[in-house]
Structure formats: C-alpha cells, structure tokens
UniProtKB/Swiss-Prot annotation:
One of its GO terms (biological process) is NAD biosynthetic process. This is NH(3)-dependent NAD(+) synthetase. Belongs to the NAD synthetase family. Catalyzes the ATP-dependent amidation of deamido-NAD to form NAD. Uses ammonia as a nitrogen source. Deamido-NAD(+) binds at residues 147, 180, 187, 267-268. Pathway: Cofactor biosynthesis; NAD(+) biosynthesis; NAD(+) from deamido-NAD(+) (ammonia route): step 1/1. One of its GO terms (molecular function) is metal ion binding. HAMAP family: NadE_ammonia_dep (MF_00193). It comes from the Bacteria. Keywords: ATP-binding, Ligase, Magnesium, Metal-binding, NAD, Nucleotide-binding. It catalyses: deamido-NAD(+) + NH4(+) + ATP = AMP + diphosphate + NAD(+) + H(+). Its EC number is 6.3.1.5.
Amino acid sequence: MHAVQRQIAEQLKVQPPFADQNALQAEVARRVNFIKECLQNARLKTLVLGISGGVDSLTAGLLAQRAVKELRESTGDNAYRFIAVRLPYVVQADEHEAQASVDFIEPDERHTINIGSSVKALAAEVKAFDGLPATSVDFVLGNTKARMRMVAQYTVAGAYHGLVIGTDHAAEAVMGFFTKFGDGACDLAPLSGLVKNQVRAIARHFGAPESLVEKVPTADLEDLSPGKPDEASHGVTYAEIDAFLHGEPVREEAFRIICETYAKTQHKRELPYAP
C-alpha cells in the first residue's frame, strides 16, 4: 500500500474488505446497532431518508428499517418508525427503479415531495444567472436540487421529530462526490467507511434484486446531462476507487485522479473554516 493510500484510508476510516459472510453479517449488525444508538441517544423515534433508486439509498434504507424494527421488538414501543421519501424533480426518468427500491425496503411510511416547483421558483429569482452559459446554470441548479432535497427531508424530520439519514460512503467521500450542505448534510451516515462493493454486498445480504444492486450509479442532477453515470464524472471506475481505498494497486492515471480530486475537495469534508 502506498503511503498516500494509507493516509486517505485512515482519514476516511475505510473498513477492510469483508473476509467472509460472517464478517459481512457482523458489519451489518454493527451498523444497525449504530443507527439504534443514534435514535436512542437523541431520544427520538423517527428516521427519514430520501430514496433515489440507487443502491446507496436502498442499502441505507434497509439498514434503517431493520433498526426501527429491532427497536420496536426490544422496547415494545411501536412509535419507532422509518419514513422513506421520494424526492423527484418534476418527472424522474428512473422512477420505476426508485419505486422498486421503496417497495423492497417496505418502510413504515412513504412520502413523495416533488422539488420541481421549488427549484424553478428559486432559479427565477436569481439574477446572477442572467447571461451565464446554459451549462453553468445547469450545474449550479444541479446542486440546488440536491440541497432542496435535503431541505425537504429535514422538513419532514422536523415535523415528525426525527433524524435524517445520509448515504455517503468512502468511495464517494474520497472523490468529494456529494453536494455540500445537500446530500452531504445529514444527522447520521450509516454507510460511512464502506467502499462501493461493500455497499452492494450489504444490499445483496438483504436479498435485494440484482437489477437494483447493479444499477448504474448516477447523481442525475443536470438537465443537460440526464442520467450521466458517476464514473463518467469521476474519470475512474468505482472498482478502481475501491481498490485504491483498500490499498491495492491501480493504474497510474487512476491513482493521480483520485489523489488530486481528494485534495481539491478537502473543504467538502470539513466543518466551515473559522479564524
């Protein structure tokens, strides 16, 4: 393992590869217990998570639903619940997969909040967009969509006195592949430290359909590049990112891209700068 790989892996608290099925099961139990402890320590009984249709929110949702189920069983308190929220922007192209994810999770409650009108209303008020290239406006509004989704989730959580779950994991964190104060904002991040193939392995452990587990990851935030795969944005594959984080050799170009991207996105992984 290169020293830089070791340093980054330590900073992101990357978990080692699952040695076997027992190790995977133990990690699932540890993360379910983590979620339960977060709720109990906060003296709250509701979890809220936006379900996009990707494997990250699918896996986080499965962990959350199991956590509240176990809390109900162990405490006898049926007030513990998990709310899955669909947050489409107008019409979502992969709505079928998103609904399939929600159906498989079987959350206690499911809500739908369309963020389209809110994002468009805000965009209409921003005079700074005047004269900007369409691609620049599209990129900025992509981040606005992510932040609006988090606003919606926190609004639901506030109404139900709950905590918001995030879906960030090590393979996204190392690339800074999240919107600051958007999908990067949450109360607890149960996938933290996992690489992408571990997130998929946990989804499979729950019996999730392979079509959802292996669905091509996409943030799908930009109207001018609908459904753009994450890997096209990264310039490297998730397999290469996972290998890098686990100290395995990767091609020279992938090593360079990951290290440079990690350095320039450091501000996204820190608290606001202060004097």
